[in-house]
UniProtKB/Swiss-Prot annotation:
It comes from Homo sapiens. The keyword Membrane applies. Disulfide bonds join 160-209. Residues 133-221 form the Ig-like C2-type domain. This is Cell surface glycoprotein CD200 receptor 2. The lineage of its organism: Eukaryota, Metazoa, Chordata, Craniata, Vertebrata. The gene is CD200R1L. Residues 24-239 are extracellular. It is a single-pass type I membrane protein. Belongs to the CD200R family. It is found in: Membrane. Glycans are attached at residues 30, 39, 86, 92, 189, 217. Residues 1-23 form the signal peptide. Residues 261-271 are cytoplasmic. The keyword Nucleus does not apply. One of its GO terms (cellular component) is external side of plasma membrane.
Amino acid sequence: MSAPRLLISIIIMVSASSSSCMGGKQMTQNYSTIFAEGNISQPVLMDINAVLCCPPIALRNLIIITWEIILRGQPSCTKAYKKETNETKETNCTVERITWVSRPDQNSDLQIRPVDTTHDGYYRGIVVTPDGNFHRGYHLQVLVTPEVNLFQSRNITAVCKAVTGKPAAQISWIPEGSILATKQEYWGNGTVTVKSTCPWEGHKSTVTCHVSHLTGNKSLSVKLNSGLRTSGSPALSLLIILYVKLSLFVVILVTTGFVFFQRINHVRKVL
């Protein structure tokens, strides 16, 4: 199985499971997978509810649990719980969506409800016990499914757009041919819009745009409007008609004026 298909399969499992985080196996209403201790690179779909699990340590052995949260463009946030005094403390934590799953003395896992592009970053849970310290880190990558659309432009080209995806989507064409241009537009929330333009000349009447993305692939087809090759756009045709009519009117006006002035000159000569 290829890497993109494997990742898509993981994302499908993420969206389909429902349970709680137990025994080192993270399972949430929208999100599930198995983690070992250490650092994990984790893709997560935007707008789901995600739970990040601590190392599977029994609460009776817990002394202190600390979550370190490092988000892009923000100061490091720390959420801590001390069992002896049943005290919680937060430092530089301003994101309201990132909270404990429940009371830290009952569940030390962290939840994000729901995930947004601003939650990209590194999360590490550190558990202090009489037997030593244990940690689990997550490199969280938020994925955004792009909106795909395909249309024909006025200059006999096909235009395919993958709007606000994260990461940037890849666009290919069927049948394969020369691509006029592929442009990427970056937005402040980390998403990217990809626009690809393909000439229609030399192709059949139908072309297909194939968009590849970590969240899934999508293909759209469009059939060339045969009238587009000869008559151009409706606006252009209207302008041509108006131009012809105006030209005829000017010719008639000039001819009539010329005849009128000729008659006046003839009458003056007779008098």
